[in-house]
Amino acid sequence: MANPKADRLIQFLTEQGITSPQVLAAIHALPREFFVAPAMMHQAYDNNALPIGQGQTISQPYIVAKMTELLALTPETKVLEIGTGSGYQTAVLAKLVNHVFTVERIKTLQWDAKRRLKQLDIYNVSTKHGDGWQGWPARGPFDAILVTAAAAKVPQSLLDQLAEGGRMVIPVGEDEQYLYKIVRQGGQFISERVEAVRFVPLVAGDLA
């Protein structure tokens, strides 16, 4: 089914330097309007972050594409997402790997995301209501960890759950935030600063 708005979004992402055909195809295939409030549907394919309630947002499509591309995913990659939010980033990951593990601290957001994923026939996702700072150690280690909220510093518990050779993409900072790619190599963590970003804060604890 033709979607001119999705076509234009993919063209924009390509112009912004996103090159992975798999990432672009996953974003093109997903109806972003399904993950936003009805009042925001007319902006669903704009390159903007949009509110989803509970003080949280759905990230702008460029950031979703960039973070996903940085993880260099293959179908076998074992992925942990911190911050399920609307479920949009989760759905993009689920199009690219065999299984996604995702943690959300706000119960109502977790429920809504699970409902959306089910309605889109996306079943290769395990969701957990819990503290994102703690990750999901019982299911680790992970080849890739994607964090969708900004931490003042990288949580050690998440570094501990990264497999050898694994990649983490995480926004770090408070007033000034930067996206980092962290690779675990031989017991060390190699950190690369990618670009300036703006995310909601990664809050410890969970909410009913």
Curated annotation (Swiss-Prot):
Assigned EC number: 2.1.1.77
Family to which the UniProt record says this protein belongs: Belongs to the methyltransferase superfamily. L-isoaspartyl/D-aspartyl protein methyltransferase family.
Annotated GO MF terms: protein-L-isoaspartate (D-aspartate) O-methyltransferase activity
Biological processes, Gene Ontology terms: methylation; protein modification process; protein repair
Source organism of the structure: Vibrio cholerae serotype O1 (strain ATCC 39541 / Classical Ogawa 395 / O395)
Active-site residues per Swiss-Prot or TrEMBL entry: S59
Protein's cellular compartments: Cytoplasm
Pfam families: PCMT
Tagged with keyword S-adenosyl-L-methionine: yes
Reaction catalyzed: [protein]-L-isoaspartate + S-adenosyl-L-methionine = [protein]-L-isoaspartate alpha-methyl ester + S-adenosyl-L-homocysteine
Major subcellular location class: cytoplasm
Gene Ontology terms: cellular component: cytoplasm
Protein name: Protein-L-isoaspartate O-methyltransferase
InterPro entries: PCMT, SAM-dependent_MTases_sf
Function, in words: Catalyzes the methyl esterification of L-isoaspartyl residues in peptides and proteins that result from spontaneous decomposition of normal L-aspartyl and L-asparaginyl residues. It plays a role in the repair and/or degradation of damaged proteins.
Keywords for the protein's UniProt record, in alphabetical order: Cytoplasm, Methyltransferase, S-adenosyl-L-methionine, Transferase
Ranges in coiled-coil conformation: none
NCBIfam families: pimt, PRK00312.1
Top EC class of this enzyme: transferase
